[in-house]
Amino acid sequence: MNTTSLSAWRSLAAAGYIAVLLVACGQSDQAGDEPSAMDRAAAKVPVTTTSDEARDLYMQGRALFDNLRFVDANNLFAQAVEADEDFAMGYFMVATTSQTAAEIFDATSMANERAASASEGEQLYISALVAASENDQSAQLDALERLVAMFPQDERTYVQLGTFFFGQQDFSGAVERSSQAIEINPKYAGAYNLLGYAHRNLDDLDSALVAFEEYVALIPDEANPYDSLAELQMEMGNYDASIETYRKALEINPYFALSYQGITINHSLKGEPELAQEAADQMLAAARNFAERQAAMFRVVTSHLFAGNTEAAMEISEVMMAEASVEGNHVAMGGTAEYMGDIMMVAGDTIKAEEYFNAALDHRLQADINEANKAQAARVHLFKTSIAAMIADDAEAAASRAAEYQAAAEVHGTAFEKRRVNELSAYLAMFSEENEAAAALFDSASQFDPIVLYWSAVVNKDLGNMDKARQLASRAANRNTLNANLPFFRADAMKLLEELSAE
């Protein structure tokens, strides 16, 4: 069994450790007509800088950031802080658009050091960023709720809070906050993107489609609206339509990496490995920096895994490791080593898997990240090696590591990590043939991980819950299409679904 690992680019993920989209402050460029521009500006979080040049660069960068053009936006935010070295929100946006962990943590520190000279609203944005960097979700939520209360007419504050809820898998909360943002400013396109994803994860695909179509209508000359719509089409199994919509995004912006990724996955889901590889190669050719090259090579890896070619997947992973080593990027090396461990674990080589998991932890402990993230890396290591021990039939080690993980996650873990406690407990129950307990625990684990869904389907089948097993197997095989775990068990999930449909 394998669980989450190297995260793929997502249409709601900004960069690095930030699990939710952090929305820049200031008056919206897409404001409606009422009330007056002066009244609306007074209702927004201000942008504090002594430099008109820095402000102009910031606003240009924010417009690009809104449309997920992170590389281009980062260049402008970097210029903004050159124009005003005390520009706290400029550093905030450098952090949210940076491509490496070292740059992210450095810019976060710079923003925090300059926060005292910023407005109270900007300070709350920065407090939320710092809390996110330290995995302190309680403090992050507190800052965001105070931000919304202080600026109840700023649509961006609602999207900020809504995206936090999205990251917590509170999709109803995300729908509520994005809808409030739209009430304030019906022309704020980013709110429709969040609304569409939240509806999708609530299985309200019709409402998701309406939101994404409105998103396209508002900014038809940007790539991301088409990318979001294409992802929904892929989730709905409309693979050919999805590919065409992704191509529309690439016609607008040939460097929009997310869309190459989507085309690659579509072809893999259609059982077209050569076309999947071709799209991944195109993604690699379009890469403009180290992070984009790594993301592209990762999709080469997953296309090989979808095709059942473990050897080729490991070979490309070694190339990723070599390039990351040249860059001295221990975060990237840690992520790749972890995924290589996942590959080996699914292949049944638990000794090799643990070697890679150990290497992943070593790299992360050497990385330019804070102590909270290093502690989280140690928890990830416990989680992974617990599962490896189960597969190796080392019940004592599995139970000991799982107990240690649970104790650490319950005190220091994020909401995601706490769901993983239930996942580990479900695996332990399943290996002990306590299927009723396993089924209940799987229900409390992440419902967006194909691995959890697959094993939950297996357990429910064994319990005779055929309708639920079919539903779970279908979701395991056909949903969460960007999830890095999907290649590992999709073929098994498809086979299980076929068996269940025949009964």
Label each region the model flagged.
Residues T50-Q79, A83, Q123-S138, D142, ...:
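Alpha-helical segment of the N-proximal tetratricopeptide repeat
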Residues A54, A88-M89, G121, E155-R156, ...:
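Helix-start (N-cap) detector for alpha-helical repeat units in TPR-like alpha-solenoids
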Residues Q79-A80, M110-R114, R146-L147, Q180-A181, ...:
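Canonical positions in the second alpha-helix
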Residues L22-A24:
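C-terminal motif of bacterial Sec signal peptides marking the signal peptidase cleavage site
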Residues S51, E85, A116-S119, P152, ...:
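Short coil turns that delineate tetratricopeptide repeat
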